[in-house]
C-alpha cells in the first residue's frame, strides 16, 4: 500500500514537472518583443516556438519581487503601451508645431515658393517704383524748365510793351512762383522717396546675397 502511494506521488510529480504556471515574460528575438503562449498549458523544453501563438504585448508583472522600494519605483515607471502613447502624442505635437511653422513661412513668402523668389519679386517691384519715380521726376523737371522759359519770354516782352503788360506780368509771375514752390515741394518729396527706395533696395540686395 505504501509502495502504491509512493508510485502515485512519483507519477504525479512527473506530470507536474512539465507544467508551467507562471506569467509569460517578454523575450528579445530579432529585435522584436514577443511572448510564447503554450495552448495546452504543458510547458516542455522541446515545444516548437513557431507552433505557439505570438502576442505583441508586454505584461506588467515582474519576474520576482524586489522589495517595497522597487514596488514604489515600479508605480512611477510606465508600461510599453503608455510609453508608445506618450511618444505618439509627442509626435503629434511636433507635427502641429511644424505645420504652424510652415503656415507662418507661407504667410511671410506671400504665396512664393522660396525666399529667393520673394526677394526677386520685391526687387522687381522696387525697381519698377524707382523707375516710375525717376520718370515722374524728369517730367516735373521738364515742366519746371518750361515754366522758367515761359517766364523769360514774358520778361522779354515787357521791353516791347512795358506799360500795357505790367499788371499781366505781375499776375503771371505770382502764379509762376506758386507753381515753382509746389514743384519744389514735390521735388523734395520725390527725392526722399527715391532715397528711401534706394536704401530698401540695398538692404534687400544684401539680404538676397546672404541667402
UniProtKB/Swiss-Prot annotation:
Primary site of residence: secreted
Residues in the signal sequence: 1-18
Keyword Disulfide bond: yes
Keyword Endoplasmic reticulum: yes
UniProt-annotated location(s): Secreted; Golgi apparatus; Endoplasmic reticulum
Cellular component GO terms held in the UniProt record: endoplasmic reticulum; extracellular region; Golgi apparatus
Pfam families noted in UniProt: Fibin
InterPro entries assigned: Fibin
Keywords: Disulfide bond, Endoplasmic reticulum, Glycoprotein, Golgi apparatus, Secreted, Signal
Glycan attachment positions: 30
Recorded family membership: Belongs to the FIBIN family.
Known partners and oligomeric status: Homodimer; disulfide-linked. Seems to also exist as monomers.
PANTHER family tied to this protein: FIN BUD INITIATION FACTOR FIBIN, FIN BUD INITIATION FACTOR HOMOLOG
The protein, known as: Fin bud initiation factor homolog
Amino acid at each position: 500500500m505504501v509502495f502504491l502511494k509512493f508510485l502515485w506521488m512519483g507519477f504525479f510529480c512527473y506530470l507536474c514537472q512539465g507544467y508551467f504556471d507562471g506569467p509569460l515574460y517578454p523575450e528579445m528575438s530579432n529585435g522584436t518583443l514577443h511572448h510564447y503562449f503554450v495552448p495546452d498549458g504543458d510547458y516542455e523544453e522541446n515545444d516548437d516556438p513557431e507552433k505557439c501563438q505570438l502576442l505583441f504585448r508586454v505584461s506588467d508583472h515582474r519576474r520576482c519581487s524586489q522589495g517595497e522600494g522597487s514596488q514604489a519605483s515600479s508605480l512611477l515607471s510606465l508600461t510599453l503601451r503608455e510609453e508608445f502613447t506618450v511618444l505618439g502624442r509627442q509626435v503629434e505635437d511636433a507635427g502641429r508645431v511644424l505645420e504652424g511653422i510652415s503656415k507662418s513661412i507661407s504667410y511671410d513668402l506671400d504665396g512664393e515658393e522660396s525666399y529667393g523668389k520673394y526677394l526677386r519679386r520685391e526687387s522687381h517691384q522696387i525697381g519698377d517704383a524707382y523707375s516710375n519715380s525717376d520718370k515722374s521726376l524728369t517730367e516735373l523737371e521738364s515742366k519746371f524748365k518750361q515754366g522758367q522759359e515761359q517766364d523769360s519770354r514774358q520778361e522779354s516782352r515787357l521791353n516791347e510793351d512795358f506799360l500795357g503788360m505790367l499788371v499781366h506780368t505781375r499776375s503771371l509771375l505770382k502764379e509762376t512762383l506758386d507753381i515753382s514752390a509746389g514743384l519744389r515741394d514735390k521735388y523734395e518729396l520725390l527725392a526722399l522717396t527715391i532715397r528711401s527706395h534706394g536704401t530698401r533696395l540695398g538692404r534687400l540686395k544684401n539680404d538676397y546675397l546672404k541667402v
